[in-house]
Amino acid sequence: MKVKDFDFYLPEELIAQHPMEKRDEARLLVLDKKTGGIEHKIFKDILDYLTPNDCLVLNNTRVLPARLIGAKEETGGKMEFLLLKRKEKDVWETLVKPGKRAQIGARFIFGNGELKAEVIGMGEEGSRIVKFYYEGIFEEILDQLGQMPLPPYIKEKLDDKEMYQTVYSKEEGSAAAPTAGLHFTEELLKKIKEKGVKLAFLTLHVGLGTFRPVKVENIQEHVMHSEYYKMDKETAEIINDTKEKGGRVIAVGTTSCRTLETIGDIEGKVREQSGWTDIFIYPGYKYKVVDALITNFHLPQSTLLMLVSALAGRDNIMNAYNVAVEKEYRFFSFGDAMFIK
């Protein structure tokens, strides 16, 4: 299949620049993957589509305020750092701009000197391996000095950092939010549980590979970046129990979906596991664990658009996307949602 098979026209004004004030009042496009039928709802109506046998699987990762503005110690020149991946306790793979000022041995300072850094090596695709020096707790310093690493298509400043976190976020380590989860409120989750639906949590730390474009013509040649995931025993038991009782495993977001499909065996069973995944799901892939998916609207020609096409069929998805554009749904991270059932 070609990348151009996943292109669609998206007017720029449909790219959501800020989150909804009330998370669960975003719009919801419901797509029946068997018939291609479409319904237009509000996100909190998701409750009507869930049954007591179902299980919702949510990614509890938390976004690090991973964008740091600092200065070169020697010259005072302004620098921008974006933390990508923790290699060791105080060592990170980092994107540094401007790169020419970040040679091995270069030292940098942030804030009033409470955080310092040194380039100790070169990483993949122009990234740098950076060691940080500080007193106290790194996460607390980062929380104080760092900014949210918003996707490149969001031009407006985010007033409240928590609006780019899910209400159930817990495990720090992502460079981007698992955005399908942003639509849930504490109240909606409570109602879902009261209906008898099981909630199961896993972790996948979202990397910036999420926003990297597919640069090859044939999608089979594309290589994904790896991301860290973990699933505990309790979550595995809830999912396996749901399958045994004939219920649906509903992934909240493509990150939960990719983790489930990484861990799942041929029979659709999962187990406690952690590791790194570079799974790439595109049409032709047979889902083992995931029965339904709650997700946002994705970029043209993106790997995530290919993932949803593998679940619902390319024609159904491209038709639904054209309808969404026509009906002026809001797209991408802060946009509206889709439920593929």
Curated annotation (Swiss-Prot):
SUPFAM superfamilies named among the record's database cross-references: QueA-like (SSF111337)
Entry's Gene Ontology BP terms: queuosine biosynthetic process; tRNA wobble guanine modification
E.C. number: 2.4.99.17
Pathway(s) annotated for this protein in UniProt: tRNA modification; tRNA-queuosine biosynthesis
InterPro entries on file: QueA, QueA_dom1, QueA_dom2, QueA_sf
Keywords: Cytoplasm, Queuosine biosynthesis, S-adenosyl-L-methionine, Transferase
Superkingdom of origin: Bacteria
GO molecular function, one term: S-adenosylmethionine:tRNA ribosyltransferase-isomerase activity
Subunit annotation: Monomer.
Known role: Transfers and isomerizes the ribose moiety from AdoMet to the 7-aminomethyl group of 7-deazaguanine (preQ1-tRNA) to give epoxyqueuosine (oQ-tRNA).
Family membership: Belongs to the QueA family.
Protein name, per record: S-adenosylmethionine:tRNA ribosyltransferase-isomerase
